Amino acid sequence: MTLDEFKQNVASGKIKDKWYFYKRTEDNKNALVRDMSSLTEFIKDKFNLDIYFVYGTLLGVIRENNFIEHDNDVDFAYISKQTNTTEILHEFYGLCAILKNHDLLSKICGNGHIHVYSPNKRNKFDLWTSFILNDKFSLVPLFDSTLNSSLILPLKQITFKTKNFLIPNQAENFLNATYLDWKIPLLETKGTINPWKKIL
């Protein structure tokens, strides 16, 4: 399926309209990026946690220096500071509680995955939990101690649409481990190598 065919299917109702990025103006995307940056600052200030791009957002930034046109959400992850899964979950639900107190928690989707609002509440983002145990990296919901931590750490800073964000240390290798043929746009499938699984 080409992007034009995808757009036609959205227009005809064959594909549900989820306000995909191709429908957004540049001004809207730039406002979204400002809200993304505000969230990274909020999480750093309140929790001393760095959040970084993962999944489709990282793919778009690396492949196109843009959002993927047929995507419709933003994916961040944070790296837990804890050293076992019990503490990681305790930290996660503590994070949820504080976000709820600030009226920024939209939904707990499962252990290690939430929908969180930007501080101005104009936009909502996916926030996933990642952690490193015994030098092995895990990320909800695809990676369960299957990657070396050197693929992720140290996180690297990039500039995306005038704002600074963090990405995995070896972003292309991370994408190689995540997606089938990630350098080629695939509209029919997310193309992930691993199935979703329960990590926490």
Per-range role (PLM):
Residues 1-54:
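Helical scaffold of the NTase/Pol beta-like nucleotidyltransferase catalytic core
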Residues 13-25, 46, 69, 93-108:
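Short N-terminal helix-initiation segments at or just after the protein's N-terminus
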Residues 28-43, 95-148, 152-166, 173-177, ...:
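Conserved catalytic core of two-metal-ion nucleotidyltransferases
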Residues 43-74, 85:
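Active-site nucleotide-donor binding segment shared across nucleotidyl transfer reactions
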Residues 77-79:
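Short hydrophobic/aromatic beta-strand micro-patches
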Residues 82-90:
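Short, flexible/disordered intra-domain loops and linkers
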Residues 178-183:
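Glycine-rich, aromatic-lined ligand/substrate-binding cores of catalytic
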